[in-house]
């Protein structure tokens, strides 16, 4: 690997350990010429997931979009950045485990809502109100009733 400082092509691995829950390897490297130390990450290259939108349009799955939606829903709620990142990781892992290269956008939204329902009810309602595009208050109230019923069963 090329040194980012002097561009010499010879480096040696000083330390290697699992990262990202075993999904990647973090390596500390040292340039054999100038001694500069830097970190690299090695990760399996995965084939892209294609999201099929409601209008039939297709685009590559973007973790950042899921993360932004979660951050917005969890704003001013007792949900940590680590919990949000874990939801993003779980949703992506579940989608990849389906084994299909094309995923309906509805499925992504449902998976995120299921995770939020178990984590924070207010964040769940916020996300659901945007995702399900509540047209009026009666639909919103119905969603709240469903959530309250589910909580009785817990």
Curated annotation (Swiss-Prot):
A zinc finger (unnamed) spans 3-34. GO terms for molecular function: ATP binding; DNA binding; zinc ion binding. InterPro entries: ATP-cone_dom (IPR005144), NrdR-like_N (IPR055173), RNR_NrdR-like (IPR003796). Its cofactor is Zn(2+). Residues 49-139 form the ATP-cone domain. It holds the Pfam family ATP-cone. The keyword ATP-binding applies. GO terms for biological process: negative regulation of DNA-templated transcription. The keyword Repressor applies. Keywords: ATP-binding, DNA-binding, Metal-binding, Nucleotide-binding, Repressor, Transcription, Transcription regulation, Zinc, Zinc-finger. Binds 1 zinc ion. Belongs to the NrdR family. Negatively regulates transcription of bacterial ribonucleotide reductase nrd genes and operons by binding to NrdR-boxes. This is Transcriptional repressor NrdR. It comes from Listeria welshimeri serovar 6b (strain ATCC 35897 / DSM 20650 / CCUG 15529 / CIP 8149 / NCTC 11857 / SLCC 5334 / V8).
């Amino acid at each position: 690997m090329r040194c980012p400082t002097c561009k010499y092509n010879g480096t040696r691995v000083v330390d290697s350990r699992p990262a990202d829950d075993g999904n990647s390897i973090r390596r500390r490297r040292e340039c054999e010429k100038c001694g500069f130390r830097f970190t690299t990450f090695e990760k399996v290259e995965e084939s892209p997931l294609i999201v099929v939108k409601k209008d039939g349009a297709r685009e590559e799955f973007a973790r950042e979009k899921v993360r932004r939606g979660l951050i917005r829903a969890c704003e001013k709620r007792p949900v940590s950045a680590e919990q949000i990142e874990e939801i993003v990781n779980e949703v992506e892992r579940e989608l990849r485990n389906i084994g299909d290269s094309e995923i309906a956008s509805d499925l992504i939204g449902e998976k995120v809502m299921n995770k939020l329902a178990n984590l924070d009810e207010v964040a769940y309602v916020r996300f659901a109100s945007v995702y399900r595009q509540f047209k009026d208050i009666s639909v919103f109230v119905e969603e709240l009733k469903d959530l309250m019923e589910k909580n009785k069963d817990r």
